[in-house]
Amino acid sequence: MRDSTGAGNSLVHKRSPLRRNQKTPTSLTKLSLQDGHKAKKPACKFEEGQDVLARWSDGLFYLGTIKKINILKQSCFIIFEDSSKSWVLWKDIQTGATGSGEMVCTICQEEYSEAPNEMVICDKCGQGYHQLCHTPHIDSSVIDSDEKWLCRQCVFATTTKRGGALKKGPNAKALQVMKQTLPYSVADLEWDAGHKTNVQQCYCYCGGPGDWYLKMLQCCKCKQWFHEACVQCLQKPMLFGDRFYTFICSVCSSGPEYLKRLPLQWVDIAHLCLYNLSVIHKKKYFDSELELMTYINENWDRLHPGELADTPKSERYEHVLEALNDYKTMFMSGKEIKKKKHLFGLRIRVPPVPPNVAFKAEKEPEGTSHEFKIKGRKASKPISDSREVSNGIEKKGKKKSVGRPPGPYTRKMIQKTAEPLLDKESISENPTLDLPCSIGRTEGTAHSSNTSDVDFTGASSAKETTSSSISRHYGLSDSRKRTRTGRSWPAAIPHLRRRRGRLPRRALQTQNSEIVKDDEGKEDYQFDELNTEILNNLADQELQLNHLKNSITSYFGAAGRIACGEKYRVLARRVTLDGKVQYLVEWEGATAS
């Protein structure tokens, strides 16, 4: 890690002997050359082997040496003192005064100096700036004054530091003045959909690069991100990915920054600390007591837990462990991968979502950022409670949805996959797969929530292979009846309960269809006798509905197993000699019912 504790002292370049109020030579003040044309701007002011200060994504300057220059992308390949290497944009590189006698403006690269836009020399780095080129504009009183003047770059270099910028001293006051304006136009920045990164890599007051998921604050008004090192309102150093703040920058407030801590819950503390541990140690799983709780206790003051601050140290572990076990869509236990059960990690390594941005998750889930994007993890339902949603994954009780989007998208996927597998012949000849008609959404809540969790990828637990035909799955109709081969019959018959329809493992033969037809004939005969009697005795439809939900697998066969949330995978498809289509299906062997 680069050391930037002495960023301000790293400006060891020799300053220009010219004073800020000293008139520049005549040759430098002329606006044109002898031929009457303006001086041509140099293509690049950097040289290979040149020592420079480069601003990193934390807002601090680090000393490095230029090894390569890319004029097309306006960037330099720099090797830093700790042997790390990176491409840095020209806008984030600061050089010392040039050794030549000519002085040009660092911004416009022009060498003229005339009122009211004279050239002013920085007393720290020796760079020259036109009064109107510098941000903010340099007042004319600075030219006539004997006090030292520092350019914007040097003010930030001497005041910014880890944990927050200086709050007292002349340089701190100068920083506050500099922060009233930005060296770029916020409206010109091209942001991503989540407003977390922009194409120009321009953030904060300093205009340098940044990583929103590390130590940065987002202004709730202009939505720009600001480095921890550049703000002056922090009382304690920030944690990585800690966005539980209401922050207003100096530009929007037209004065000092505004900062307010948002309340934390135990799940937020566990999530935030696990994220910090993963960033620091570059691994996923941590011991919940030896590592996680140690980190929480050591950084208890930096967490600013609010109402939880008075919780005794002996009781904290109980609350944290409860949160780790309750939010299974957010945390992953080691026992899921055959490790120790007291090991925990984040399912997706993203920072926790603060409550003040929960309303934006419907438009842009947290997991869609390009740094942490994982395919197939996108919430499709509106988010009503920030505690039920984490990083774009909707919590549905203890059932987790991994690897595919839930909700309507899954139903469409089932429909598209299943429709080609069906025809009228297969439906009429396979009674165990007959399905109900139209769906009653309000009456089949528990049922429909399970149907959306069908997984085509299979599972790692015990499996069994059977042959059946996959068909479209629907919910319960309002009449709580279903249509079967042209006749109406009740959906729930207690004494005719059968098993789930799992056939013994055997080779698929044409005689299977004959067995199915025999069973269908017997079944139709029984239902014909009981049809009128049962319809007259269905007084309490609510009880019948509950019974139907509990025994749905008895009548729907393979579709019933799908309705109960059992995962399956289609392994093969074949057409028999008599034209029947059969499928080889691998079942997980366990359902959610």
Curated annotation (Swiss-Prot):
Biased composition (Basic residues): 12-22
Signal peptide range in chain numbering: none
UniProt subunit comment: Associates with the PRC2 complex, which consists of the core components EED, EZH1 or EZH2, SUZ12, and RBBP4, and various combinations of accessory subunits including AEBP2, JARID2, PHF19, MTF2 and EPOP. Forms a dimeric PRC2.1 (class 1, PRC-PCL) complex consisting of at least SUZ12, RBBP4, and PHF19 or MTF2; PHF19 and MTF2 stabilize the dimeric structure which enhances PRC2 interaction with chromatin.
Region listing for Disordered, in residue ranges: 1-35, 360-411, 424-486
Gene3D superfamilies in alphabetical order: 2.30.30.140, 3.90.980.20, Zinc/RING finger domain, C3HC4 (zinc finger)
InterPro entries: KDM4-like_Tudor, Mtf2_C_dom, MTF2_PHD1, MTF2_PHD2, Tudor, Zinc_finger_PHD-type_CS, Znf_FYVE_PHD, Znf_PHD
GO MF term (any one): zinc ion binding
Species in which this protein is naturally found: Homo sapiens
GO terms under biological process: cellular response to leukemia inhibitory factor; epigenetic regulation of gene expression; negative regulation of gene expression, epigenetic; segment specification; stem cell differentiation; stem cell population maintenance
Cross-link (Glycyl lysine isopeptide (Lys-Gly) (interchain with G-Cter in SUMO2)): 360, 522
Zinc fingers (PHD-type) by residue: 102-157, 201-255
SMART domains recorded: PHD (SM00249), TUDOR (SM00333)
Residue span(s) of domain Tudor: 44-101
Biased composition annotated in UniProt, kind: Basic and acidic residues: 360-374
Family: Belongs to the Polycomblike family.
Polar residues: bias regions: 23-32, 445-454
Chain positions found as Phosphothreonine: 24
Name of the molecule in the record: Metal-response element-binding transcription factor 2
Keywords: Chromatin regulator, DNA-binding, Isopeptide bond, Metal-binding, Nucleus, Phosphoprotein, Repeat, Ubl conjugation, Zinc, Zinc-finger
